[in-house]
Amino acid sequence: MPIFLSLYISNMSRSIWGPATWYLLHCMVLKIDDNIQRPVLEDLKNMIYIVISNLPCPMCSNHAVSYFGAHQYTRISTLEQLRFFIYSFHEDVNKRLKKTSALSYAEHVLYYQPFNLSMVIKNVIQIYENMNNTNVTMMMYSFHRRRMVSDLDQYFRKHASLYRA
């Protein structure tokens, strides 16, 4: 895909899908039970990877996947490590976008804790389902995003009892 098309699509709606996706990622790791078992942690990590691999901006997804690989995402073995990883990832993206973040790790936990998880999920699903792509290449990405939304729904149905609203 031409770089200008990717930039146009990413800038066109990043202000909408970007914050919604960050709320989702932070809430996924902060609102889950602190005592989850290893298989649940792996499910969570897999779902997060699916989300970042299917962002509405292919260039953003490529950066995210590269970051996860370079920072050994697969080696994360505790929930606390995963929580800090998502925080650090968000900070890295903010730096790359020349945005300033005034939140320490502890402040970010306090910031995201009050969010209503079911509303965050509904918002993400609504945003991702309502993106229209007319370009053939972008339609392929749209297909994968729809699959991601379905996977996300299944993930939360399976693990609903482990999450605080």
Predicted features by range, described:
Residues 1-165:
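Aromatic-rich, lipid-facing transmembrane alpha helices and their immediate juxtamembrane interface loops
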